[in-house]
Amino acid sequence: MKKRFMVQPLCTGLICAGMFTACMSTGVGAASQTGGSVHAGTGYIPLEDFFKNPSKSRFTVSPDGTHIAFMQAWKNRMNIFVQKRGSDTAVRVTAAENRDIADYFWANNSLLAFLQDTGGDENYQLFTVQKDGSNLKNVTPFKDVRVEIVDDLKDNEHEMLIAMNKRNPQVFDVYRLNFTDDSLTMIAENPGNISGWMTDHDGKLRVAMTTDGVNTGVLYRKTEQDPFEPIMATGFKDTFSPLLMTFDNKELYVASNLGRDKAAIYTFNPETKKQGKLIFEHPEVDVESLIYSEKRKVITGAVFYADKRGYHFFDTQRAELQAELEKKLPGLEVGISSANRDETVYIVRSSSDKTPGAYYVYDTADKSLTLLADIAPWIDSTKMASMQPIQYKSSDGLTIHGYLTIPAGKQAKNLPVVINPHGGPWARDYWGYNPEVQFLANRGYAVLQMNFRSSTGYGKDFWTKGFKQWGKKMQDDVTDGVRWLISQGIADPKRIAIYGGSYGGYTTLAGVTFTPDLYACAVDYVGVSNLFTLFETLPPYWEQGRQMMYEMIGDPEKDKALLEEVSPIFHIDNIKVPLLVAQGANDPRVKKEHADQIVNALKQKNIAVEYMVKDNEGHGFHNEENRFDFYRAMERFFAEHLSADR
């Protein structure tokens, strides 16, 4: 059951998380055979093995526990399949040929709902289909309209709540969708300032999150007949993020950093407008996620991310279940991704840094754990490289956390390195299986990922230290990571590349622009090159956050000099190393103009640049054939300019 929906990535407790993060489906391999790093040899793994579609993925169990759905490739696109629990025979229920299905869920015991966009435009439409594949319908066939799920109303077999920007492209209203006749009834009109909605445990719309671009707030009502009233107002630099209501539907569980640096879990009384009991805190990182039992009506634990994912359990039954699963799957990260209504059948996902893992079904009746599928059975975990948590100091004394992956069988000495800054930038990198990282390591490159300042999860102070620091202190944190690798003797100073997507693409361009002697080459993937263009081309449903972004990045009018100073497009003359630029033609976040501008300017200066554009992609390459093309180009490019010896 979805209890909370934010219509845009602005105030989710990780403010603006993932706004400029490339949305690539990296899958889970014969590659171009040129250059010192891509010849076949001991340990060589075909490129396609890293980036082809998973064997099967995204397993879910029906509410009654009798059927299991999953996604699998058909005609190179991810489609939905359904099988009876205990059976190996599956029925394909969708026939997507042009675009992967983005997400799906069980609407009731016999009906599935799924979201799909067109060519990466992120205007998701909602479809329904019977579990036998019959009666497929597009229930929101509206042009240039984006659909999101507010609440799937698990206890209501005939309806769900969705949000759409149909009336006004800048804001999302809430509609009740009836599956019986496919009717849509607006139940809440957005006055213009609401950025998210939340239901109670009865599916009633009780909470709304607001923003005026700089300040954020929370609205509450006792019943759906009452008007919304404000219960909290903060500046956007503070986190006060409703997670779900208590099970009596009277109070809220919230993630809050009011009066503190790290966000923690509290209760909040909407009648008194007072923050209540501290539920859980972590001394080093933000805590912004709860797990709970809908059947038993208890919160069972909190989830946090330090170097790796961690749990803190409040509930003996859930703690014992976790211990049992970890005992059955030793050495792996284990989580529950789906459950039936009675919580007697669970879908379990395992993974690690060396394997994308597998899905299992766990039956509480006999405590059996049965393998459903390996996500990528062709990946041999014994041939993968270890991802090690690391930390180093920035030039002004901050501790920067990150991950270093050394090629399997190699000493951490004088290696060619790919620096891989994450997108967002208000996001973070995590420990776990990463096909890009493993691919690069298999080709002989060490990979450094770092959570530079303004990465989320490390507290308010660390996050705000990156405001108006694009190309400055945020960039220095990346540069300091490179210099740390060199000082440790890990990196060969003459064989260092930088590659990133979205904000990471900006960091890539800034790296070769502002530290032109540090890198041998660079790969910019759907990256920002011009901050003025960025603000001129925001998607309409990001308008609510424009002023907030001005505070965080810079105002095109008030901070014109700053934006010119840190936009790579205005400093082309500094670039002197080869670039590979990749872009989706339909990108709604970082428009193609960014790539066009940087490529045209480089060509005019006779600077070596390769340009790949995919017409049927958006903010990242989802289609398998496009992933293959991109990584083949990257493989050849790095082989030519870094010459890693295997």
Whereabouts are the PLM-identified features?
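Active-site-proximal cap/loop segments of hydrolase catalytic domains
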Residues: F452-R646
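Bacterial N-terminal signal peptides that target proteins for export
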Residues: K2-T12
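Mature N-terminal segment immediately following signal peptide/propeptide cleavage
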Residues: A40-W74
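Cap/lid segment of the alpha/beta-hydrolase catalytic domain
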Residues: W378-K494, G501-S502, T507, E536-R546
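Glycine-rich His-Gly loop
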Residues: S351, N420-G424, G584
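Peripheral, non-catalytic segments that deliver or gate enzyme domains
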Residues: F51-S57, K75-I80, A95-A102, A107-H401, ...
